[in-house]
Curated annotation (Swiss-Prot):
Upper lineage: Bacteria, Fusobacteriati, Fusobacteriota, Fusobacteriia, Fusobacteriales
Keyword hit for Cell inner membrane: no
Organism (species): Fusobacterium nucleatum subsp. nucleatum (strain ATCC 25586 / DSM 15643 / BCRC 10681 / CIP 101130 / JCM 8532 / KCTC 2640 / LMG 13131 / VPI 4355)
Protein name as annotated: Transcription termination factor Rho
Family: Belongs to the Rho family.
Positions contributing to ATP binding: G158, K159, G160, Q161, R162, A163, K170, A171, G172, K173, T174, T175, R201
Domain Rho RNA-BD: 45-115
PROSITE patterns xrefs: RHO_RNA_BD
UniProt cross-references to Pfam families, sorted A to Z: ATP-synt_ab, Rho_RNA_bind
NCBIfam families registered for this protein in UniProt: PRK09376.1
UniProt keyword annotations, A-Z: ATP-binding, Helicase, Hydrolase, Nucleotide-binding, RNA-binding, Transcription, Transcription regulation, Transcription termination
């Protein structure tokens, strides 16, 4: 009854229809719950909810279920309803018969909170039409959000952006990711924010969970098996794609692409070829597939991925991974070790950071003012002076519109 209690009246009506239960016109929610419950009892079945995991042979299992057990799903059911790995499935479930070991789905009732007709008509993610981002995430809503305001000026991020945060060690990337996540949650109520932490320290996972309220945090820490890093990542990207297929907007902040590529390099079977640094070329395919999934869908939803990638670690492998990814994003945000050593935070290198096709995210007046700002910042002797001047200007103005209106005076106060 717990599942029935959480369902809306229209959901109960749809379930009754799929279960071939005759119901009268205008029946109330409590009556429908009782009728469905009686039908389940007569059939010796029950309702269960879980996440579909498919096998190469075509069949699958619902995992992380409300029953606490894996539930078998036949290949014919998966094919009929065009179900895929990661789908959240609600079904009528029967107990094992004879020598069977698992509970099994008798009927599929709903998936991803949609009715069955919507499932059968959905367009696969890969067939949706990608376009350049045209709707900006405004991150600098609050005066004190320096990171968000700098990004809005220097590297604006839009729905469907594929952004790389190029980060050397000790440049404050974890704090930077937290500030972006908080800004997204504060200003973008129509987008889900997910944080994916791969091969991170457990205490950093705890820190982000405590400091970012409203985001869903997924993590596989450095003491987990690399196979778990991959499992978590692949489940997350499939869930995100399904939400975008339904017209929703999802933002994934990944820390980091480098460690994800390292995990694939350990787990993937060797191709017999090695790039410089000891990385197998085939190990880069899956992380690229993950990062490349970010896109803005024409007349639909969007998947935005903001991912860190490590540089200047002293590892040749990390250098090769960066070289493979550096031309794949459409927004580059460079963090700088020198700025961090001078205790200038956020340590964003404003001379190197930028967004491709930023004119699609900003209006004509904003573009002209921001390009003027860039020219003024380039007049400084070095990036330390330029970044310090911009941060000071941000602190003395209420918002970016006010800052741009006071150029060039505000930079030389």
């Amino acid at each position: 009854m717990d599942i029935l209690n959480k369902l809306l009246l229209k959901d109960l009506q749809e379930i009754a229809k799929v279960m071939e239960i005759e119901i009268g016109v205008g029946q109330k929610k409590d009556e429908l719950k009782r009728i469905i419950s009686n039908s389940l009892e007569e059939n010796n079945t029950e309702l269960a909810y879980g996440t579909l995991d498919t096998a190469p042979e075509g069949f699958g299992f619902l995992k992380e279920t409300t029953l606490g057990k894996n539930i078998y799903m036949s290949a014919s059911q998966i094919k009929r309803f065009k179900l895929r790995r990661g789908d959240q499935v609600l079904g009528e479930v029967r107990k094992p018969i004879g020598e069977e070991k698992n509970y099994a789905i008798r009927r599929v009732l709903k998936a991803n909170d949609n009715d069955l007709a919507a499932l059968e008509s959905r367009v696969p993610y890969e067939e949706l039409i990608p376009t350049y981002p045209t709707e900006q995430f405004v991150l600098g809503i609050e005066q004190g959000n320096i990171s968000g305001r700098i990004l809005d000026l220097i590297s604006p991020i839009g729905k469907g952006q594929r952004a790389l945060i190029i980060a050397p060690p000790k440049a404050g990337k974890t704090t930077f990711i937290s500030s972006i996540a908080n800004a997204l949650i504060e200003g973008q109520k129509d987008s889900e924010v997910w944080i994916l932490l791969i091969d991170e320290r457990p205490e950093e996972v705890t820190d982000i969970k405590e400091n970012v309220e409203g985001a869903t945090v997924f993590a596989s820490t450095f003491d987990d098996d690399p196979k778990n890093h991959i499992k978590v990542t692949e489940e997350i990207i499939e869930k995100a794609k399904m939400k975008v297929e339904d017209g929703e907007n999802v933002v994934i902040l990944l820390d980091s692409l480098t460690r994800l590529a390292r995990a694939y390099n350990i787990v993937m079977p060797s191709s017999g070829k090695l790039l410089s640094g000891g990385i197998d070329p085939t190990a880069l395919y899956h992380p690229k597939n993950f990062f490349g999934a970010a896109r803005n869908i024409k007349d639909g939803g969007s998947l935005t991925i903001i991912a860190t990638i490590l540089v200047d670690t002293g590892s040749k492998m990390d250098e090769v991974i960066y070289e493979e990814f550096k031309s794949t994003g459409n927004c580059d945000i460079y963090l700088d070790r020198q700025l961090a050593e001078f205790r200038i935070f956020p340590a964003i290198d404003i001379t190197k950071s930028g967004t491709r096709k930023e004119e699609l995210l900003l209006n004509k007046n904003q573009i002209d003012d921001i390009w003027n700002l860039r020219r003024l910042l380039n007049d400084y002797d070095n990036k330390v002076s330029a970044t310090s001047a911009l941060i000071k200007a941000i602190k003395t103005t209420r918002n970016n519109d006010e800052l741009l209106a006071q150029l060039p005076k505000v930079l030389y106060k």
